[in-house]
């Protein structure tokens, strides 16, 4: 009898150990870190500069709508199993989201300059990336507020000879860290461009472009609902998405609206002036290319402090 009890106790311990190990493994498998990059031009209802910056008469309201769309993505990601969420405020001055309306367990990256730009904070610990409020690239004739990085200064950005949008550029940075883009929101033109570049990701169409400054848009409530639905769908099949990879080293071509930036940058040996308004540079990978583009966009001799 005593021997039987010893055997039974041993079996029980073994079962407990196996069960604990399985529980630990399952817990590790359930970890899901999500990065959400939030721009504003692709937010439902946005059509002109009046919604996009502090001087616009509708900016205050549209900060709320932008935050609502980000929150819809966050809540849906949590419902789909996300255990860690990092949000990058990636429009204008990088200080648009009403962060007091976001959950306490979310981290938020704000303002500039910052490494990796619109996808700052992404690394190889992230499992999936989401783009909210994205817009079409500067060479697109139909997208609402279409531009690439700077509507005031740039007319073209190309990566390995192919014109890029902010979406495809940021997808390539994420791909450098083996992070797939699983979902995006924006107008129909923006979605079509990104899908053409990186594949058939989940997408929430917040509006249909009628021109640079006009759109047939969903309401803020409907946009948020559609974003939530598509985020849940994307994370429900997250293993099906693959990182967007570009060949390294990378070659980047940048064309400016004015000739002086190209002339002055060409003084630096890393830049080659390819025509009156354009420069070219090469980088070992997308992380380095991102840093150089950040320098091009952010450096001013009168920067303070």
Place the predicted regions along the sequence by residue:
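Bacterial N-terminal signal peptides
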Residues: 9-21
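A glycine-rich helix N-cap at a beta->alpha junction
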Residues: 104-122
